Design a protein with these regions (language model features):
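Short capping motifs at secondary-structure boundaries
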Residues: 81, 88, 94-106, 137-138
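N-terminal secretory signal peptides and thylakoid transit peptides that target proteins
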Residues: 1-20
Length: 259
């Protein structure tokens, strides 16, 4: 079976496709013990206006069709929900693997992740793996709409931290002299928080969403450490994995649940 090429996130995969609120953090769930952030009920702006998509495509030398999945921008109303403050790390995933005798990622040393990667987002997990973890933790995967609201708040901002790209706010590959070295610890970019205080939602590892755009496929949000353009690191950017059983070095996940 053909697997999605890692660089597809950065280009044609997209075609296939707040006001600051001081909010309390949610209680940890009993199974994975990790903090979740409350995202309040209400409307938010999802996607990108057609005129803005055209401007961005010209500015970043992309074909406008690559942004087609984001257009038109629309106002969506969502009920309150909670979302993990950070992506699921190798450390957290190891607890699940050992508790459930679940198959670990292939690059691990048996059921133990490489020690230097403990606090990095878990990768080499497909969407079924992500859902299995979420079920164990008493959670679920977020929808693309929930993910986007948690990332951009209600003011329609371009990036989780604002409308201007900040090279120090996320893990990326934007013209750096050295080749990208992979993921980073999920706490490595404190300047990258969203209006709600959700972290690491741009770059590092792209994240599986619950939506099914087509049979066997899935939406990805957040860009990744391989991203070579700010265009793919925006809150509204939407990638698509043609196969939701892909296990790749740039795809991870975080969980959500009802408030």
């Amino acid at each position: 079976m053909k697997l999605l090429n890692r660089r597809e996130w950065l280009g044609t995969s997209i075609a296939a496709s707040v006001t600051w609120l001081a909010l309390p953090l949610g209680a940890a769930t009993p199974d994975d013990g990790e903090t979740m952030v409350l995202i309040p009920a209400g409307p938010f702006l999802m996607g990108t206006a057609a005129s803005e998509a055209e401007r961005l495509a010209r500015e970043h030398h992309y074909h406008v069709s690559w942004l087609g999945g984001e257009v038109p921008q629309r106002t969506l109303e969502l009920p309150a929900f909670r979302i993990d403050k950070y992506p699921v790390t190798n450390r957290r995933y190891a607890a699940f693997v050992n508790a459930m005798a679940y198959k670990p990622p292939a690059h691990w040393n048996g059921t133990e992740p490489p020690a230097p990667l403990l606090e990095h987002p878990v990768t080499f997990v497909n969407r079924a793996d992500a859902r299995a973890y979420a079920k164990w933790a008493g959670k679920r995967l977020p929808t693309a709409a929930e993910w986007e609201k948690a990332a951009r708040g209600t003011d329609g901002r371009m990036f989780p931290w604002g409308n201007e790209f900040d090279r120090e706010a996320c893990q990326h590959d934007l013209g750096d002299v050295k080749p990208p070295t992979g993921t980073a610890p999920v706490t490595a970019h404190p300047r990258g928080g969203s209006p709600y205080g959700v972290m690491d939602m741009s770059g590092n590892a792209a994240e599986w969403c619950a939506d099914n755009p087509g049979p066997g496929s899935a939406f990805l949000k957040g860009g990744c450490w391989l991203s070579e353009s700010p265009l793919t690191l925006r809150c509204a950017a939407r990638g698509m994995s043609g196969f939701d059983n892909n296990q790749l070095d740039y795809i991870g996940f975080r969980c959500a649940r009802e408030a």
